[in-house]
Each structure stands twice: as structure tokens, then as C-alpha cells.
């Protein structure tokens, strides 16, 4: 397809989970990072010129993605490029997506063979056929296509961009709004002509308008300057925009139907390859309804949990409804329920950590409790 890609790393509202990492580099599903979904969606569509924009704390993201080899992006021309946050900005860091694009104009100008830009965020995880979105965008004749999801708007969750549609046409848009079922939620995936994007960004940023949803899409549509097409996505879409959503969406992967949709064979989700020995299940281990990555040592009881690589659960320990990241050790007779344990955590022998479904306990990286 005649398009280039922009990935926004998004800081989100995940508190300590993203204090020292971007949303894009947040571990998910036992062996992935959230950016893997955006990169895979774009690369599977044949898009080979992709820029990743990040505000800060992007070292772990760069370490994970590297030169993009796993996604077929280690190319002499095009390929993957990290767009640094301070390239041309006089304010130190950008305030919104339009300002970040303004700082990445050189990247857009280099892609003189591409007519369209596909912009995706790393907070919403899905396995979407970007070629179908591009085809629908071109067929619509509209300036911007917004990918949306039904069933997210319920009047209780604040939606970044909520869109009302009747007979295939947009009738209203709201930003940061507790939208009801009348609306569909933007998945933060947009398609726009490259020349129009560059022109719009130049004009809006000069007027101190820096937000994609509010200023370009909704603002342009309300002023009659931008026509908007809506592409309704019918597959699984996981909005990881809070700690509670991240926790619930992670555990939803235990459901076979969710996994089958999110990791469909037609569009694989690629990630950095790490060779590890198989997981060891001791004679006293009991593991039920879990996703377990390679290299774990399991001698205790684990139920309804996600275990990343090289996790140790010692004999007598109980782990239930938990997300346990790489190299974490849960010692003998410890009890951990409804918790997110970051990398290299040690839960000492006999310790009890009991959270709740709506308020999981979080233990930060490297802590001993």
C-alpha cells in the first residue's frame, strides 16, 4: 500500500506502570510489548516506512524494537525510525500529537513515494487489517478515516474521541466525554492524506492547536474544513488506558476466543525473539487456566494468571488472578492474589499480597516485599 506509518507511544494513565517506560514498551500477554501490535499491524499491511514518536523514557522501547528486524523493517531505504521528542521543539517536549508531528516533518517529507499516513497509538491493542482500512478510506473520498469500536461507550468511561454516526455519516463528535451507547469510540487509528496532514499541522500548530482529536479531527469537521469517514472494527480491541483496564485485559487473554482474535494466524503479532529453555513444572505444581512463557520454574499453585519469562513460583506458594513479569520470584508459602508484579520482584516466603479485581496491588520493578 502507498502509505507510511506513525506510531504514538502514549503515556496514558497507568501510574507507576509507565513511570520509567512508555506505554508502547509496557509488557503484555506473557512475551509481548504493546508496540508489537502496532508494528505488526503496519508491517503486515506492507507498510515499510514507519516512525515511532515518544515523549520520554524511550530507552527500553529502543532496546526492544532495535532496527525492526523482527517486523521486516531493517531496510536501507525507509524502514523504522525513532523520532526524538526534542528534534525541533523549543518547549522541550511536545504537548500533543500535532506538535509531535510538527517536530517530525523531515520524516514525512522523506517519504515522497507515499500518499497516505496511517497513525496508530500503542494504548489500544488489536489485530486489524490496515489494508482494508486504507481501501475503505480511499473509497470513501473523505479526508480522514477514524477507526472506531462499538460497545466501549457506556456513559461511565471517558472517551478520547467519541463519534456519533447515522446512515454511515458522522453527526457529532465529542472529546474527553463520558459518551453513551449512541457513540462509538475512536481506537486512535487514523488515515489521512500526507499532504493534507502536513498542511493541517503547519496551520494548527502555528495557532497553538496541538491535539489530534480536538483540533484536527473534531475541530476540522465542525468547521467544515475536514470530512470524516468512520471505519467500524468488529474484532477484539483492548483499551489499556488505566491500570484497571490493563489488568482486566491482560487476564482476558486466558479466554481462547480473545487469544484467537488478537493473535490470528492471518496477521501474526511479531516480537523480539528471546531463546529460553522450556518451563519446568515440578511434581507439586498445580497450574490451571494460565498463560505461561518460557523459562519459568513452577513448584507452587498458579491459577488464572499471566506469567512472563523466567518467573519462579516456589513450593507452597499460591498465585491467583495475577500478572507476573519477567524474572520475578514468589517464594515458599507466599500468597498473591489480584496483583501486578513488575520485573525482578521478590515476594518473600510467607508474605500475603491480596488485592481486588477492581483494585489490583502493584509492586514496582526490583522491589522485595
Model-inferred region functions:
Residues 1-8, 195, 203-369:
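Left-handed beta-helix
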Residues 1-251, 363:
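Unchanged
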Amino acid at each position: 500500500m502507498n502509505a507510511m506509518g506513525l506510531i504514538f507511544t502514549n503515556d496514558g494513565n497507568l501510574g507507576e506502570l509507565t513511570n520509567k517506560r512508555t506505554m508502547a514498551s509496557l509488557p503484555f500477554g506473557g512475551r509481548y510489548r504493546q508496540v508489537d501490535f502496532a508494528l505488526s499491524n503496519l508491517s503486515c499491511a506492507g507498510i515499510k516506512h514507519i516512525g515511532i514518536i515518544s515523549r520520554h523514557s524511550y530507552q527500553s522501547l529502543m532496546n526492544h524494537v532495535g532496527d525492526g528486524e523482527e517486523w521486516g523493517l531493517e531496510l536501507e531505504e525507509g524502514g523504522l525510525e525513532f523520532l526524538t521528542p526534542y528534534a525541533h521543539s523549543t518547549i522541550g517536549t511536545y504537548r500533543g500529537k500535532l506538535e509531535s508531528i510538527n517536530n517530525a516533518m523531515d520524516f514525512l517529507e522523506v517519504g515522497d513515494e507515499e500518499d497516505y499516513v496511517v497513525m496508530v497509538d500503542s494504548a489500544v491493542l488489536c489485530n486489524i487489517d490496515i489494508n482494508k482500512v486504507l481501501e475503505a478510506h480511499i473509497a470513501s473520498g473523505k479526508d480522514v478515516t477514524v477507526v472506531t469500536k462499538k460497545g466501549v461507550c457506556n456513559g461511565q468511561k471517558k472517551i478520547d474521541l467519541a463519534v456519533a454516526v447515522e446512515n454511515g455519516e458522522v453527526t457529532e463528535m465529542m472529546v474527553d466525554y463520558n459518551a453513551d451507547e449512541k457513540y462509538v469510540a475512536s481506537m486512535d487509528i487514523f488515515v489521512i492524506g500526507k499532504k493534507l496532514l502536513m498542511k493541517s499541522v503547519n496551520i494548527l500548530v502555528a495557532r497553538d492547536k496541538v491535539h489530534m482529536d480536538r483540533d484536527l479531527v473534531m475541530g476540522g469537521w465542525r468547521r467544515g474544513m475536514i470530512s470524516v469517514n468512520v471505519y467500524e472494527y468488529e474484532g477484539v480491541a483492548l483499551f489499556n488506558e488505566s491500570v484497571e483496564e490493563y489488568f482486566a485485559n491482560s487476564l482476558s487473554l486466558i479466554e481462547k476466543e480473545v487469544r484467537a482474535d488478537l493473535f490470528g494466524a492471518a496477521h501474526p503479532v511479531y516480537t523480539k525473539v528471546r531463546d529460553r529453555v522450556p518451563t519446568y513444572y515440578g511434581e507439586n505444581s498445580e497450574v490451571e487456566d494460565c498463560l505461561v512463557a518460557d523459562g519459568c520454574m513452577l513448584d507452587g499453585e498458579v491459577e488464572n494468571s499471566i506469567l512472563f519469562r523466567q518467573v519462579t513460583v516456589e513450593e507452597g506458594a499460591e498465585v491467583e488472578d495475577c500478572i507476573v513479569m519477567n524474572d520475578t520470584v514468589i517464594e515458599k508459602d507466599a500468597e498473591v492474589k489480584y496483583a501486578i508484579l513488575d520485573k525482578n520482584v521478590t515476594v518473600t516466603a510467607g508474605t500475603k499480597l491480596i488485592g481486588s479485581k477492581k483494585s489490583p496491588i502493584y509492586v514496582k520493578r526490583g522491589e522485595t516485599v
